[in-house]
């Protein structure tokens, strides 16, 4: 699994570096690259490749999808780390973008990464049917704005030190994390003509995203900052509404196992073609950073 992740990281980073190299250079490109590279494990990109394998989608198309997703993800991390949000100093084992370059520069770098995602998907060299292209841009827009990441982050901040129901926490985590995972699982399907698979993989993606968020919360609960590459135990200090704070550590693990079983049951009909996707899901649960 580690070799497959490294391969994904290298391929996506190469695409993004080449894409940026062809653009007119600006002073803002330095903090943009700082927030984007080397990046994390590229789990979202790996899911795109995994689902692409199920439906036999060419890698050259998957690279556009994954690069756009990583731009969105990096933008969200830069903004999440800001003092007015989660106020973090360390991300991916190094200073957060605002600590390195200042708050205003970090905001602008994050904004630029958000728009870069749309630039990549609308690029004429991403040579797909225009209706499919519009569907992808529409979907990633929903995943990033008030119906997705931004809306989820708003709720995350708003729920601090409050009693919140399990369903509200789940809805918040699906917005904050699950929607972009849903795009990762759904976008390769959109490139095919298998419309009957769209709803199914949208739900699978949301569930994987929820699984990822639970795993992330478990890392915050039990790991060290050195291992995780970011501050840990910050959720409890800030009174964050998480499934761990609501259900307890053991019950959160049980809920994650239930989710995994549901996802695996949904993949039964795809045989060996879904083996990479299942392996990635197992990795999401077992990771320590």
Regions from the language model: what does each represent?
Residues 1-20:
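N-terminal amphipathic/basic leader segments beginning at the initiator methionine
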Residues 1, 288-289:
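C-terminal end-of-chain micro-motif
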Residues 17-268, 272-288:
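Mg2+-dependent prenyl diphosphate-binding active-site environment of isoprenoid biosynthetic enzymes
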């Amino acid at each position: 699994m580690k070799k497959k992740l490294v391969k994904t990281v290298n391929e996506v980073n190469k695409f993004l570096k080449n894409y940026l190299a062809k653009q007119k250079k600006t002073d803002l490109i330095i903090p943009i690259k700082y927030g984007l590279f080397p990046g994390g494990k590229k789990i979202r990109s790996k899911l795109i490749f995994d689902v692409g394998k199920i439906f036999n989608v060419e890698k050259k198309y998957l690279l556009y999808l994954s690069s756009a997703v990583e731009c969105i993800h990096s933008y969200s991390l830069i903004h999440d780390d800001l003092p007015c949000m989660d106020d973090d100093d360390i991300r991916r084992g190094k200073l957060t973008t605002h600590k390195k370059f200042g708050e205003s520069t970090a905001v602008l770098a994050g904004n630029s990464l958000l728009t870069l995602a749309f630039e990549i998907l609308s690029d004429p060299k991403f040579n797909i049917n225009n209706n499919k292209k519009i569907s992808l841009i529409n979907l990633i827009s929903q995943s990033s704005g008030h119906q997705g990441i931004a809306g989820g982050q708003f709720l995350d901040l708003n729920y601090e030190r409050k009693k919140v129901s399990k369903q509200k926490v789940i809805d918040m985590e699906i917005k904050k994390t699950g929607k972009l995972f849903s795009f990762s699982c759904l976008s390769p399907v959109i490139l095919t003509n298998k419309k009957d698979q769209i709803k199914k993989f949208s739900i699978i993606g949301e569930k994987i995203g929820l699984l990822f968020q639970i795993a992330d919360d478990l890392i915050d609960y039990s790991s060290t900052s050195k291992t995780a590459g970011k501050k840990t135990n910050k959720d409890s200090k800030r009174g964050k509404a998480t499934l761990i704070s609501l259900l307890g550590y053991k019950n959160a693990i049980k809920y994650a196992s239930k989710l995994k079983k549901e996802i695996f049951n949904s993949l039964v009909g795809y045989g060996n073609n879904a083996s990479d996707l299942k392996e990635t899901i197992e990795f999401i649960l077992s990771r320590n950073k």
